[in-house]
Regions:
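Phosphate-binding glycine-rich loop
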Residues: 1-6, 20
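A short helix->loop->beta-strand "cap" motif at the edges of active sites that frequently abuts
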Residues: 5, 26, 79-83, 109-111
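Structural detector of well-ordered beta-strand residues that form the stable sheet scaffold
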Residues: 8, 29, 85, 114-116, ...
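Hydrophobic alpha-helical segments in the ANL/AMP-binding
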Residues: 16-23
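Active-site phosphate-binding strand-loop segment of PLP-dependent enzymes
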Residues: 29-104
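Conserved core segment of the aminotransferase class I/II
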Residues: 106-184, 191-197
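Conserved PLP-binding catalytic core of the aspartate aminotransferase-like
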Residues: 187, 201-205
Length: 205
């Protein structure tokens, strides 16, 4: 993770990926996500890069990679000595069989991938800055895990304790039931919107 790294990002995607790396002075390459590739660019279209960002389900398109598609990205990362930064913020909305909720559903991904996730989508924690990052020990012989731990303990003291307790409650039996109820409500709203767009003949992702 140096200033000289080349960064590969799908286009369109969550803009912070680009902004963060522009501020660091890194070279940015764009991988078009289009209707032709179902908004899911694959590694056979990708140039060499040191780091690739994958947001799945994607913000803003909602397109979601299957486990099989992510296998190809993991193989690409190994062949290119690259690291995948996998943003799983919207994984809680994945219900279709075969679609991935985590990059680590792919065998070997722990050797090339870092996963980040947020409580803002699954539990409505928007604004509390609470989430988690998984940096596997298998990645770069554990060096990145140690570097990340040192960085976090030096520059960040964690979110407020009351927020941590709220996040802890998310994973209780009662918390998961309540969250599932809310997610079902969101999905119903999405279905209503999709039906209205279909009726009006409006194309959407």
């Amino acid at each position: 993770f140096s200033q000289d790294n080349t960064i590969l990002v799908p286009d369109p995607v969550y803009p912070v990926y680009v902004d963060d790396n522009v501020m660091a002075g890194r070279k940015i390459l764009y991988l078009p996500a289009t209707a032709e590739n179902h908004f899911l660019p694959m590694p056979d279209e990708a140039p060499h890069a040191d780091i690739v960002y994958i947001c799945s389900p994607n913000n803003p398109t909602g397109a979601t990679y299957s486990v099989e598609q992510l296998k190809a990205w993991v193989a690409w990362a190994k062949a290119n000595d690259a690291v995948i930064l996998f943003d799983a913020a919207y994984e809680c909305f994945v219900t279709e069989k075969g679609l991935a909720r985590s990059i680590f559903e792919v065998e070997g991904a722990k050797e090339v991938a870092i996963e980040v996730c947020s409580f803002s989508k699954i539990a409505g924690f928007t604004g509390t800055r609470c989430g988690y990052t998984i940096v596997p020990q298998a990645l770069a012989d554990g060096k990145l895990n140690k570097m990340w731990l040192r960085r976090q303990t030096t520059k960040f003291n964690g979110v407020a304790y009351v927020v941590q307790r709220g996040a802890e409650a998310v994973f209780t039996e009662e918390g998961m039931k309540e969250i599932q109820h809310n997610l079902d409500y969101y999905r119903q709203n999405a279905a209503v919107i999709a039906a209205a767009l279909d009726e009006a003949g409006v194309w959407y992702c």
